[in-house]
From Swiss-Prot:
Gene: HBB
Protein name: Hemoglobin subunit beta
Residues the record lists as N-acetylvaline modifications: V1
Expressing tissues: Red blood cells.
N6-acetyllysine modified-residue sites: K59, K82, K144
Protein role: Involved in oxygen transport from the lung to the various peripheral tissues.
């Protein structure tokens, strides 16, 4: 992903103001609520029968933290997202058979949750930069599908 210095600064500033684990848990939870067909990949997570069940589910929160930790690592390697996410792309493609469109949906959830948590501090410039990043991450995760 090519980002200007201003975009990199906007990402760093915004990311520095949030609790990553909270962002991950809420983003994954929202994905499972808003796009319920994504729940099929999480059969072992127990009760996902309602929005409150999903958002309060400890396994959703734990996996959301794993997801956002990987995303956070990607923020440190913006010039090599395909390499950074190669093993996760292979896992999600070959073993889990996740539809790569879901990566785009999750990226959008991350942006929505960032906006929710940061309010006015999530400027249009920061959003534009994050949209580039989540698109780049989704593309990197879908790489093994091509």
């Amino acid at each position: 992903v090519h980002l200007s210095d201003g975009e990199k600064n906007a990402i760093s500033t915004a990311w520095g103001k949030v609790n990553a684990a909270d962002i991950g848990a809420e983003a994954l939870g929202r994905l499972l609520v808003v796009y319920p067909w994504t729940q099929r990949f999480f059969d072992s997570f127990g009760d996902l029968s309602s929005a409150s069940a999903v958002m309060g589910n400890a396994k959703v929160k734990a996996h959301g933290k794993k997801v956002i930790d990987s995303f956070s690592n990607g923020l440190k390697h913006l010039d090599n997202l395909k390499g950074t996410f190669a093993s996760l792309s292979e896992l999600h493609c070959d073993k889990l058979h996740v539809d790569p469109e879901n990566f785009k949906l999750l990226g959008n959830m991350i942006v929505i949750v960032m906006a929710h948590h940061l309010g006015k501090d999530f400027t249009p410039e920061a959003q534009a930069a994050f949209q580039k990043v989540v698109a780049g991450v989704a593309n990197a995760l879908a790489h093994k599908y091509h």
